[in-house]
Every structure is written in structure tokens, then in C-alpha cells.
């Protein structure tokens, strides 16, 4: 194992050297990972929004965001500040409790998914053995918030949008889970750390995308549908439902839906990187590179550099997936609701189930 840096011990040692007591350092450490996680997730969303607007503008031969900061990089932040100062309007005949809780129930489970995303062997907030099941479980809670928002708005368009979101999630959650289970069978583990380590031995040739090409394609389609991205944005189709479940929302509650959508897209891209593209592993095994350069893997400088390389590789693969999803948005038309459900139940479900059975059969045959 190359990366043996213990972030918690390093943090406690650093503050002890500054003269702080051990108890104070531990108390300071407890909320720090969650706080950093939220900050990184929000910054990641701002970057994704800016990239989408610039790439979309390039596809349509426009300039895109230009005035707020260099190349318009501060435009998403300006939009967020604008929404923060907007008036919060609640429908007079709506269900106030459901209307208020809906956006929070959508966003919180998606943020929890970041707890098990690894950026390195020890660069993970919570390395639990059932990490993949945890992600599938918490991601299935978000559609309940959409349904609550649609019902609590007391608006027919909002309610229809909430129903569509629930039906869409049910249709694509099962194929997504089956694709992930195929990867878990190959890796003999449900831990995200173990899944990446299984792929890192032979470099790019060991990545799961070569062993699970059908599962990778099915995973991408199901992930885009779960994120309600075009061509699967039926719950908020403007031409049919005004804005779907978001119709009655204003201010930061309205902004929470957009944050949830982009955070979910970023999480899906991170898991695509971890499950199929080797996560933090380089295309060439790091041990081979160290031997060629005559470097010692136990040196702290080498470990720090390898940690930063791992983070960079994870983000590079993640943003490659995001780039493909943005291009898909502008190259494919929106499907009808019957086509959406047919694709999920009649095509993706049998394909992902067959892929799982084939993977299990090969594992049994190789025992």
C-alpha cells in the first residue's frame, strides 16, 4: 500500500505542536471532515454549473457567462447569492410541513453519499464495509422528497412532477443497483476502497470498464435517469409541467433543488470513476513508475505526491463523465414518459440482470 498517511493523527499532531491540548484538538477534528465535505461539495457544484454553462454555450456557438469574474467563473456564486435574498413564498392552500421538508429531504441524503467516496486509500471520510449499499440506500430516499414537494405545493403540475420523479426513480434504481452488484461480485467486496484496489494492480488494463462494458453503459444510462438529466428530465419538463415539482418554490428552497440535482450528478460521476475507471489509480501502476524512477515508496514526499496524483486522477475521470453528460443534454431530445418507463423496465432491467447472472456464473466457474 503506497498511501499510509493517517489524516486524523497528522491533524492531532499538528495542533499539539501548536500548543493546544489533545482534548481540544479531538473536539476540533470531529466536525471538520463533515464541514470540509460540505464545502468541497458546494465548490464542486459551482464548478459543474460553470462548466455546463460554458460547454452548452460552446455547443450552441454562444459566449456564455462572461462578466462575473474571469471567464464568468463567479456567475454560479452570483446566482446563488441572488436566490438567497429572494422572498420565500409558501402556497396559501399547500401543506406547509411537506412543502418545507421536501427540499431538505432531497439534498441531505445526496450529501451523505460523499461520506464513502474515496479519493485515496485513506482519503475517505468513512470507510464502511457496506459502502456501496449505503450509497444505494440513501440515494433512494431523495425521490420521497420530490413527491412530498409536489404534493405539498397543492399544484397539479407540481404533483404530476413529483409522481413522475417517483416513477422514474423506481424504474432506474433497480438496474443501477444490479450494475453495482456486478462490480461488487468482481471485487469480492462492498467497500469502495477495496473496489478501487482490485482495479489498481494492472493499471488501465485492470479497470472494470473492460470487464463490464455492458454494465458500464447501463450504469451511465441509469445514473443520468436518476439525476433527471436530459433526455430523462420528465419530472420538470418545461413544455408540459411548467417546472414540475419546483413550480411553486422560490428563493433558497428553489435553489436547493438545483444544488441537489448537480450534487447528485457529481456523486454519480464520482461513483462511475470509482466503480469502472479505477478511482484514484493511474493508467500505469504507481509501483512500476516508482521502480523506473528509483524512488522509495515509504518516503513521505512520495506519499504526499501520490496522494495528490490520486485526487487529480479521480477528479479527471469524474469531469470526463460530466463532460459526456453535458454533451448528451444537447445532442438528444427528451423522451416521452412511456418511452422512459419502457427503457427502464423492458430493456435496462433485463440487460443489467443478465449482466449480473453472467458475472456470477463466471465467478462460480473460476472457483
Swiss-Prot record:
Presence of the UniProt keyword NADP in the record: yes
GO biological-process terms attached to the record: aerobic respiration; photosynthesis, light reaction
Any single Pfam family the record assigns to this protein: NADHdh
GO CC annotations on file: chloroplast thylakoid membrane
EC number, UniProt record: 7.1.1.-
Localization per Swiss-Prot or TrEMBL: Plastid, Chloroplast thylakoid membrane
Enzyme class: translocase
Keyword annotations: Chloroplast, Membrane, NAD, NADP, Plastid, Plastoquinone, Quinone, Thylakoid, Translocase, Transmembrane, Transmembrane helix
Transmembrane segments: 29-49, 96-116, 128-148, 176-196, 204-224, 266-286, 304-324, 347-367
UniProt cross-references to InterPro entries, sorted A to Z: NADH_UbQ_OxRdtase_su1/FPO (IPR001694), NADH_UbQ_OxRdtase_su1_CS (IPR018086)
Catalytic reaction equation(s): a plastoquinone + NADH + (n+1) H(+)(in) = a plastoquinol + NAD(+) + n H(+)(out); a plastoquinone + NADPH + (n+1) H(+)(in) = a plastoquinol + NADP(+) + n H(+)(out)
Principal subcellular localisation of the protein: plastid
UniProt keyword Transmembrane helix, yes or no: yes
Membrane topology term: Multi-pass membrane protein
GO molecular function: NADH dehydrogenase activity; oxidoreductase activity, acting on NAD(P)H, quinone or similar compound as acceptor; quinone binding
Source organism superkingdom: Eukaryota
Function recorded in the entry: NDH shuttles electrons from NAD(P)H:plastoquinone, via FMN and iron-sulfur (Fe-S) centers, to quinones in the photosynthetic chain and possibly in a chloroplast respiratory chain. The immediate electron acceptor for the enzyme in this species is believed to be plastoquinone. Couples the redox reaction to proton translocation, and thus conserves the redox energy in a proton gradient.
HAMAP family, A to Z: NDH1_NuoH (MF_01350)
Assembly and binders: NDH is composed of at least 16 different subunits, 5 of which are encoded in the nucleus.
Family named by the database record: Belongs to the complex I subunit 1 family.
Name of this protein: NAD(P)H-quinone oxidoreductase subunit 1, chloroplastic
Gene: ndhA
Amino acid at each position: 500500500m503506497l498511501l499510509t498517511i493517517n489524516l486524523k493523527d497528522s491533524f492531532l499532531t499538528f495542533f499539539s505542536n501548536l500548543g493546544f491540548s489533545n482534548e481540544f484538538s479531538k473536539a476540533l477534528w470531529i466536525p471538520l471532515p463533515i464541514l470540509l465535505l460540505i464545502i468541497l461539495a458546494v465548490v464542486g457544484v459551482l464548478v459543474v454549473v460553470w462548466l455546463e454553462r460554458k460547454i452548452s454555450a460552446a455547443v450552441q456557438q454562444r459566449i456564455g457567462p462572461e462578466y462575473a469574474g474571469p471567464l464568468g467563473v463567479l456567475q454560479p456564486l452570483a446566482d446563488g447569492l441572488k436566490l438567497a435574498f429572494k422572498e420565500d413564498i409558501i402556497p396559501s392552500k399547500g401543506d406547509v410541513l411537506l412543502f418545507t421538508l421536501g427540499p431538505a429531504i432531497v439534498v441531505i441524503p445526496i450529501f451523505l453519499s460523499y461520506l464513502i467516496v474515496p479519493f485515496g486509500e485513506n482519503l475517505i471520510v468513512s470507510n464502511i464495509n457496506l459502502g456501496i449499499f449505503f450509497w444505494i440506500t440513501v440515494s433512494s430516499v431523495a425521490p420521497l422528497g420530490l413527491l412530498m414537494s409536489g404534493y405539498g405545493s397543492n399544484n397539479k403540475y407540481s404533483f404530476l412532477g413529483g409522481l413522475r420523479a417517483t416513477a422514474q426513480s423506481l424504474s432506474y434504481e433497480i438496474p443501477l443497483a444490479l450494475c453495482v452488484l456486478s462490480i461488487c461480485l468482481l471485487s469480492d467486496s462492498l467497500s469502495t476502497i477495496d473496489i478501487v484496489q482490485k482495479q489498481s494492480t494492472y493499471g488501465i488494463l485492470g479497470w472494470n470498464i473492460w470487464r463490464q462494458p455492458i454494465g458500464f453503459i447501463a450504469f451511465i444510462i441509469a445514473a443520468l435517469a436518476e439525476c433527471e438529466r436530459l433526455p430523462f428530465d420528465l419530472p420538470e419538463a418545461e413544455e408540459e409541467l411548467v417546472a414540475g415539482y419546483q413550480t411553486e418554490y422560490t428563493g433558497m428552497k428553489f435553489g436547493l433543488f438545483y444544488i441537489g440535482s448537480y450534487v447528485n450528478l457529481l456523486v454519480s460521476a464520482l461513483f462511475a470513476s470509482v466503480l469502472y475507471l479505477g478511482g484514484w489509480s493511474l493508467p500505469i501502476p504507481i509501483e512500476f513508475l516508482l521502480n523506473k524512477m528509483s524512488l522509495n515508496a515509504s518516503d513521505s514526499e512520495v506519499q504526499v505526491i501520490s496522494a495528490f496524483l490520486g485526487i487529480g486522477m479521480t477528479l479527471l475521470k469524474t469531469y470526463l463523465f460530466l463532460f459526456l453528460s453535458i454533451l448528451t443534454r444537447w445532442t438528444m431530445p427528451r423522451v416521452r414518459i412511456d418511452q422512459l418507463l419502457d427503457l427502464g423496465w423492458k430493456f435496462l432491467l433485463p440487460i443489467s440482470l443478465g449482466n449480473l447472472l453472467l458475472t456470477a456464473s463466471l465467478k462460480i466457474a473460476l472457483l
